[in-house]
Amino acid sequence: DVGHHFQGAVAAPEPDPSKVSNFVFAPTPVTEETGEREPADKEKILMVDAGLFAIREIMEDHPESLLYGQDVGRRLGGVFREAATLAEQFGDHRVFNTAIQEAYIIGSTVGMCAAGAKPIVEVQFADYIYPGLNQLVTEISKSCFLSCGKFPIQTLIRVPIGAYGGGGPY
């Protein structure tokens, strides 16, 4: 009965002002940097390769992780080849293309997290990010606060910027 629940809400005590900032930030086990930034015995690599290797590492360590977005699937492997070989290694069920629909790409991470996945998504160019900002700002960034810490969205959103070319009329 809606009326009963409404009366319960009206009768509820006022929120405690000292707790208003609880759950603004999701807890993290990472509190400091570890490892060496430039190990002496390693060769330097291109930034695009570093991104590829980082995603590969995440996908190897977390079988529930997925990579999807614009042109990251097997055929192209990313506009800058930043996802090359990932579909071959992890399969088309974990690395796949989506429609060119930035709001969907970013917003779908909420549902993917609810289903137990660890989504990694890519918007093809920073020029295209604007339609997805509403999902990022109103849903993902506030998920820990709005759920009282019960459902912080864990996603990684990759957006290439600063390379040659561009994508949109922005």
Label the predicted regions:
Residues 1-19:
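Active-site or pore-adjacent capping/gating segments
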Residues 21-170:
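Thiamine diphosphate
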